[in-house]
Amino acid sequence: EYSYCDYAIALVAKGLGKTDLYQQYLKQSSNWKNLWRADYEHAGVKGFILPRDKEGNWLDKIPFGNSHIQKPTFTYTPVTFEGPWYTPWWNMFFYEASSWEYALSIPHDVPGLIEQCGGKEKFDERLDIFFDKGFFNVNNEPSFLTPCLYHWVGRPDKSGDRIHEIILSLIHI
């Protein structure tokens, strides 16, 4: 979300003729790639937005709780429902969606996202898995545009099908 906001600021700066600010924020809008972990695999898909510590190391285990004795942790996964029962809906790294959802929420750089995912065919497969395995959550803003991403791989028919499925699931027909 920060990268998208940086992109929006860049566009405003460009419109105001502030070239230096435009360049600065346009560059910052690519920072989502710093959190893209290409080697991480989940549900047969590689590449996710994942947390790093302040030294830049990937965080595979997340500390949870305030115990000074046990220092409890749990292994991080890109979906919240795989965490322990005491894991909050949002944890300290993601606010309102899962890594699966945020990894598809790069609306200002969809071509870059498709490239990170391994090309159009892999991206199409990734979208299928995302929807078929139930990782899509219509209640989360980062997922709102995801059904339309099939357009970017030449499959607007699949976008239409997914949107139709979503509508039917919401009105329970």
Per-segment meaning from a language model:
Residues 10, 14-151, 156, 160, ...:
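Catalytic cores of carbohydrate-active enzymes
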Residues 1-4:
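Hydrophobic, small-residue-rich alpha-helical packing segments that form membrane-like cores
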Residues 171-173:
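Conserved small/polar residues in nucleotide/adenosyl-binding loops
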